[in-house]
Amino acid sequence: MRLTKIIPKIFYEDFKDGLHLFVDGLKFKVVYNDAKLYIIIRDDVTIQLLEDAEYAAKDRPEIRIETDDIAAFYKEVKEAHPELLHPNLNIVKQQPWGLKEFALLDKTTVCVIIQQQ
């Protein structure tokens, strides 16, 4: 038996903010949606977006997504939606702990760090 993935839930007051970050900015595809839930997928990564103002006010997460080609991923984001790049990590940076990283930040302060080993 083994664990195969983690699927985060991210709460938004308004879905459009999450869809801008993940669908427009990171090119996730919507595979399901209803009045309170979107399930989005890109490659092997699945995320659930939930519309709930109470929980959105309580939790603005930071998540990490690993890629095998950070330069191409960065180029894709920078060309399509540079406004989503995090002001504190808006270039690909080699970190002292061995990862290459850049980050995105939406207007609700959900942070997504893209990393490569």
Task: Please describe what each predicted stretch is.
Residues G18-D24, V77, T109:
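Conserved active-site tyrosine of GNAT-family acetyltransferases
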Residues K29-P61, C111-Q116:
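Conserved short beta-strand elements that form part of the metal-binding/catalytic scaffold
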Residues K9-F11, E51, Q95-G98, A103, ...:
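Short beta->alpha transition motifs characteristic of CBS
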Residues M1-L19, I63:
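N-terminal beta-strand motif that seeds the catalytic metal site of vicinal oxygen chelate
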Residues M1-T4, Y55-R60, P96:
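Short glycine-enriched loop/turn motifs at secondary-structure junctions
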Residues G25-V30, H81-E83:
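Conserved acetyl-CoA-binding loop of GNAT-fold acetyltransferases
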Residues R64-C111:
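Vicinal oxygen chelate
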